[in-house]
Curated annotation (Swiss-Prot):
Belongs to the fatty acid desaturase type 1 family. DEGS subfamily. A lipid is attached at residue 2 (N-myristoyl glycine). Residues 95-99 are annotated as: Required for C4-hydroxylase activity. CDD domains: Delta4-sphingolipid-FADS-like. It comes from Bos taurus (Bovine). This is Sphingolipid delta(4)-desaturase/C4-monooxygenase DES2. The chain crosses the membrane at residues 45-65, 68-88, 209-231. GO terms for biological process: ceramide biosynthetic process; sphinganine metabolic process. SMART domains: Lipid_DES.
Length: 323
């Protein structure tokens, strides 16, 4: 468990991200793809059902022994809360109510945030725009680990710890890499979340709040669904910086596995991403792809060529001009 990862730096490239050019080519060849850029009519109902399910779980958690509370937080709540963060990801692209109603999408994301226990939705949207616009951009894309992470988490045991601590790194990294001023929506997100947490605590006590927070921390940490964090952009094959996953867990994660398709067309809702591949299979079928997030996690931990440094990075124009 002590072998160090083989990489000592990121994979620096001097080309633009590939998705912009792919998008232009595909739209020119398949204009029917534009018809997929419409709101998901079922997203709001699915998310509402998930939020209500977690509220019911909170009520049930009052009578659970602590060991069972943490078991169900991992086995059930972790799946639901992780999936809700992926719903928030989808909503951040205005797929719940359409691009013409950005305010409704923002407030609905805050509603979806409620079972997560901590304010997340507004901050995620603020930084996720840069992830698409400046994929791998040095100092801009906060999805890319820091040098500190790459140098410290370089052995199997440390990489395992890094995976378990993903919620903390995703929270703290933006503050270190690309700090931004707090927005009004972030303040609203925080106030609404605190009010919801206080209400749950007042009604049902401590255990439901512990259940929700444990669901988020465990579900976003060392959990099978968390394989998507690594599968999406970690360089399993040199020259490829985005990968899709075509496995069964897409059914409960809003098709987040269709990640190549998503970066090619961010405005297409998750429910329509499989149709992109169906319309233009020659753009996807030959690319390297994943079929098991558990295997992704296993390979990441035990393959010396993989680690936090196994990411493509580039210097973007905005980064050059920031000073």
């Amino acid at each position: 468990m002590g072998n160090r990862a083989g990489r000592s730096d990121f994979e620096w490239v001097y080309t633009d991200q590939p998705h912009t050019q792919r998008r232009k080519e595909m739209l020119a060849k398949y204009p029917a793809i534009k018809a997929l850029m419409r709101p998901d009519p079922y997203l709001k109902w699915t998310v509402t059902a998930m939020v209500l399910a977690q509220l019911l779980a909170c009520w049930l958690a009052q009578g659970l022994a602590w060991r069972w509370l943490f078991f169900w937080a991992y086995a059930f709540g972790g799946c639901v809360n992780h999936s809700l963060t992926l719903a928030i990801h989808d909503i951040s692209h205005n797929t719940a109510f359409g691009t013409g109603r950005p305010s409704r999408n923002r407030w609905f994301a805050i509603f979806a945030n409620l079972p997560v226990g901590l304010p997340y939705a507004a901050s995620f949207k603020k930084y996720h725009v840069d992830h698409h616009r400046y994929l791998g951009g040095d100092g801009l894309d906060v999805d890319v680990p820091t040098y500190f992470e790459g140098r410290l988490f370089c052995t199997p045991a440390r990489k395992l710890l890094w995976l378990a601590l993903q919620p903390f790194f995703y929270t703290l990294r933006p503050l270190c890499v690309h700090p931004k001023a707090m927005t009004r929506m972030e303040l609203c997100n925080t106030l609404v979340q605190l009010a919801a947490d206080a209400t749950i605590y007042a009604l049902w006590g401590l255990k439901p709040m512990v259940y929700l927070l444990a669901s988020s921390l465990l579900g976003l940490g060392l959990h099978p669904i968390s394989g998507h964090f690594v599968a999406e952009h970690y360089m399993f094959l040199k020259g490829h910086e985005t990968y899709s996953y075509y496995g069964p867990l897409n059914w409960i994660t809003f098709n987040v596995g269709y990640h190549m398709e998503h970066h090619d067309f961010p405005s297409i809702p998750s429910c329509n991403l499989p149709l992109v591949r169906k319309i233009a299979p020659e753009y996807y079928d030959h690319l390297p792809q994943h079929h098991s997030w558990v295997k992704v996690l296993w390979d990441f931990v035990f393959d010396d060529s993989l680690g936090p440094f196994a990411r493509v990075k580039r210097v973007c124009k905005l980064a050059e001009n920031r000073l």
